């Protein structure tokens, strides 16, 4: 054990260098790597040193593009599950009675079925005790089927407790860190997504969704789900509490409550998570595949910074993405980046802008941000992300890259009005030189922000394929997002002359009175208050 902890201090990280990790990935057969584009071979070598590797035939990957289809598939997979259902989400919407009923019916129909749910404790109990919340919605499943069949866990950031928690408003508490993974597993299949489980994500909130029908990959994410669950509170019934539920710390958990001994908790959680982040179970069906079937390689990457020792953060997401972006060194390469909450990590932004590849950024227009026209402080959140987009455009201009890097705003109606949608998609796509379709994508929960790499728990996958159909489907996914995207440039932030009524003389005849000077105003959805400038400078890392 001493040697394990001494290793922490012998491998200190710096902001300027990306560390090399050791994994238990076997060396890829030369016949396999040679069948991919030559530019991808070095990427395989670099990612093999960071994250576990899975070979998944492209026929086992399905891309969904519509929230209604996502919901229908989710319900169908729950209904047909025989062994296990595991759902990791920020929260389950307090009105999702149909989804809970679907899980209940699956449990009733199959006595061998086990259900495991992981949400965030702060977000999942925000409305309690006055109103319904995720916890009050879920507790009837435990009451009816027992905690031996329904294991509901709620992760609480270890870095918020005591006076800080009691004095800070509930919604502000959530800025200290959340369980942000979105893993939806059913037997030997899993959906990776950026979507949570609430009605807007099932109807009119655009996101991304990949369905993998692969047992080994599903088992890996199930292991991640279980590990974080074993560092979380368990939701149980309570006849004494007005809410009908309580959160308790099981003795079977892998460490003590963080509020009791934070140092020990971080030590135990680091010890638990390191082998999962770096290794995979060696038992593998890949050797049964013909070389012709090996057309897609997947690297699961996760960011668990709040649970890891600060001197040895062995999270794999940030390091893998920065390695991947070092590949953008050719004008013949294309990349696409999207985030509904646009506040790009500076190191990611630097690599995207500094590379030679041409790029497209898609972000939410203010009227597609779920906080648009909301009450209180959150009213200014769309402005904050708009400011981040403006700063990005300024940096692109300063680097002389306006001809090859474009930013688009996604908008489909006005959120919270009839037929209005919001935008929550996040991801990255990259092509090889001289190809129009991407062959690499990242799917998962991360928004690629400073917050994602310091406060929240994130889980994603890097997908690299040579399959023509899967590449086409990746491009179709981009095209689907671009349908509602319009260019945003720095000129859009400039004041524009407003239409003036034709001057009328006292006698009522038009044109005889001298016209008023033109009135110049910035468009309503381009205005950014001074307070937002200050707030982003101070609190930008929480966005």
Q: What label would you give each PLM region?
A:
Residues 2-79, 97-191, 195, 199-204, ...:
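PLD/PLD-like phosphodiesterase catalytic module centered on the HKD motif
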Residues 28-68, 248-320:
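Active-site cores of enzymes that catalyze phosphoryl transfer or operate on phosphate-rich substrates
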Residues 82:
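A short acidic, Gly/Pro-enriched loop at the edge of an enzyme's catalytic core
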Residues 166-170, 193, 222-275:
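Extended catalytic-interface subdomain
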Residues 299, 312, 318-334, 352-356:
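Acidic, glycine-rich loop-and-beta core segments that form the ion-binding/anion-interacting portion
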């Amino acid at each position: 054990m001493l040697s394990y902890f001494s290793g922490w201090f012998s491998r200190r990280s710096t902001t300027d260098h990306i560390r090399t990790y050791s994994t238990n990935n076997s060396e890829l057969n030369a016949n396999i790597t040679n069948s991919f584009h030559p530019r991808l071979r070095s990427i395989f070598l670099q990612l093999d040193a960071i994250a576990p590797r899975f070979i998944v035939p492209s026929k086992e990957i399905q891309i969904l593009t519509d929230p209604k289809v996502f919901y229908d598939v989710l319900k169908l997979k729950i209904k047909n599950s025989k062994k296990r259902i595991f759902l990791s989400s920020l929260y389950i919407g307090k009105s999702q009675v149909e989804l809970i009923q679907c899980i209940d019916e699956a449990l009733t129909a199959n006595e061998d079925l086990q259900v495991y749910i992981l949400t965030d404790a702060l977000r999942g109990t925000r409305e309690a005790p006055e109103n319904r919340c995720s916890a009050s919605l879920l507790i009837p499943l435990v009451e009816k089927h027992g905690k031996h069949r329904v294991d509901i866990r709620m992760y609480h950031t270890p870095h918020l407790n005591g006076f800080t928690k009691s004095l800070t408003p509930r919604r502000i508490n959530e800025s200290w860190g959340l369980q942000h993974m979105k893993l939806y597993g059913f037997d030997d299949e899993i959906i990776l997504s950026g979507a949570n489980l609430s009605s807007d994500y099932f109807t009119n909130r655009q996101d991304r969704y990949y369905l993998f029908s692969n047992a080994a990959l599903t088992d890996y994410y199930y292991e991640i789900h279980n590990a974080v669950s074993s560092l979380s509170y368990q939701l149980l019934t309570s006849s004494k509490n007005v809410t009908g539920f309580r959160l308790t710390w099981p003795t079977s958990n892998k460490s003590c409550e963080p509020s009791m001994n934070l140092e020990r908790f971080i030590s135990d959680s680091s010890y638990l998570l390191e082998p999962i982040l770096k290794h995979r179970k060696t038992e593998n069906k890949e050797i049964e595949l013909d070389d012709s079937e090996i057309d897609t390689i997947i690297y699961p990457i996760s960011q668990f910074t709040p649970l890891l020792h600060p001197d040895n953060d062995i999270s794999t997401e940030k390091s893998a993405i920065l390695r991947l972006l070092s590949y953008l060194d050719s004008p013949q390469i294309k990349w696409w980046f999207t985030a509904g909450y646009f506040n790009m990590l500076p190191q990611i932004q630097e690599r995207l802008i500094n590379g030679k590849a041409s790029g497209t950024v898609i972000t939410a227009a203010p009227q597609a941000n779920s906080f648009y026209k909301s009450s209180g402080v959150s009213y200014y959140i769309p402005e904050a992300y708009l400011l981040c987009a403006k700063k990005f455009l300024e940096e692109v201009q300063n680097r002389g890259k306006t001809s090859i890097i474009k930013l688009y705003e996604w908008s489909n109606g006005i959120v919270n009005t009839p037929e209005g949608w919001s935008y929550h998609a996040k991801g990255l796509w990259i092509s090889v030189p001289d190809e129009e379709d991407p062959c690499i994508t990242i799917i998962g929960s991360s928004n690629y922000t400073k917050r994602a790499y310091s406060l929240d728990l994130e889980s994603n996958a890097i997908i690299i394929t040579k399959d023509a159909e899967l590449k086409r489907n990746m491009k179709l996914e981009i095209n689907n997002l671009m349908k509602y995207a319009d260019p945003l440039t720095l000129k859009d932030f400039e004041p524009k002359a407003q239409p003036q009524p034709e001057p009328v003389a006292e006698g009522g005849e038009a044109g005889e009175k001298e016209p008023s000077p033109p009135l110049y105003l910035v468009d309503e959805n381009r205005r950014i208050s001074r307070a937002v400038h200050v707030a982003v400078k101070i609190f930008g890392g929480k966005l």
